[in-house]
Amino acid sequence: SLAAFPEIAVKALEAKPASRHVDLEKLTRDFLLHDDQPHQSSSGFGQPELIVYDNPKFYIQALFWLDGTTDIHQHEFSGAFQVLEGSSIHSRYVFENAESITAHFRMGDLKLQETQLLERGDTVPIVSGRSCIHSLFHLETPSVTIVIRTQSDPGTGPQFTYLPPHLAIDPVQGDFLTLRRKQLLDVLEHTASPEYASLILKMIGTLDFERGFFTLQNAMGHLRNLGAWDQAWAAFSKKHGALAKPVLPSLLEIIRRDALVAMRSSIEDPDHRFLLALLLNLESREAVLAMVARRYSGDPLENIFHWAVELTHCSESGTWILNAEFPDDIELPPDEQAPLFLTALNHFLAGGKTPPELKSVSKKNLSSLRAALESSAWKMLLK
């Protein structure tokens, strides 16, 4: 039965672990040089996805990941996956108080259940439907997983993607009119059309809730740059009343998560990616410190600060620690910005008395430094 398949897949992978029995170089060569391969899908999941065995009821795939971070999602299939190469941060969630707005749009409360570090040889069951909501943040390049999965499990769709803390959407719904409208709005953004904001406002006034949300989600970044976001949100909120209330926290969380995921593509060091994964997926300072302590020896805060030093970037445009920018209102030569910014970060991470290096800094400038860090990915870790 379908209910038994995840356990069957786990036992098969654990009985003959891919990490010990699959030669990745040979698999790559054979796939490139021999045409006698199973039928390949058009799926965009994986970078790439290789189907290495196909059966009418199930198939086996090798998923490569270069800079991929999966959305929080559920599955319309069941089975299991095993880490062949690399490691990942794996997070599980539950979606409580769920309410269907349409067949493709749900509201509720997404709660983090568990976060674990998956390493080579670790195996995880996949249960179709809403009882298995998860995400993966891959640390090494490449990371490779072997998946044994059914073709599709009837009655377990749609395969929702979750937008914390409150929304679930069907990413493959066939609303092609909304798709084309979003693409056309992208053209107007690219060409700096002066009508962009006014057209969005008119659309928000006429579109239903679901289409209005997707339009806002697509336009949010440009509307903020134009200074028109507050007006657009007010129009959406006025039109939809209490139904709109859970939307804003999810839209703001999209901005935070997208910023962290975007940094992942330019960061290859596994330790730095590990920090990004924790900042993206965990919800408290204590949880981050516990996960760092689990993987690395030494003081977790010292490890985090060491990574912060390595992640500091100075250029003509400014000084950055991850996505925290040195404040414009502090007048300081460029070569002195990074030492001050890092000293402030170290102080706000550890708490306690002000260190000697910061005693000469004015309260106003110290507040600006803290505000810059609080508006970035570092916020969760500050004391």
What are these regions (language model features)?
Residues 46-66:
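A short glycine-rich, His/Asp/Glu-containing loop-to-beta-strand
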Residues 60-74, 127-129:
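Conserved short histidine dyad/triad with adjacent acidic residue
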Residues 82, 95-128:
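Short acidic-glycine-tyrosine-enriched beta hairpin
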Residues 1-35:
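Low-complexity, highly charged intrinsically disordered N-terminal segments
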Residues 76-96:
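Glycine- and acidic-residue-biased ligand/ion/polar-headgroup-sensing regions
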